[in-house]
Curated annotation (Swiss-Prot):
This is Uncharacterized 6 kDa protein. It comes from Cassava vein mosaic virus (CsVMV). It is a single-pass membrane protein. The chain crosses the membrane at residues 32-52. Its main location: host cell.
Length: 54
């Protein structure tokens, strides 16, 4: 049973491609979150974040 890593519920073979997929998903979540924060900031203070909103 060597070479198997369990991430939350699903167990994957500890393969580089699987690790890359997990990292890409985390990066996408961070990007989406930061985009959401920017949109909220644009609504709260549109003058200060005007250059970002354009």
């Amino acid at each position: 049973m060597k070479g198997i890593k369990c991430l939350s519920i699903t167990c994957f073979l500890s393969d580089n491609s699987i690790i890359r997929v997990v990292l890409i998903r985390r990066m996408l979540k961070i990007l989406l979150f930061s985009l959401l924060v920017l949109i909220i900031l644009c609504f709260i203070d549109p003058i200060l974040f005007y250059f970002i909103c354009l």
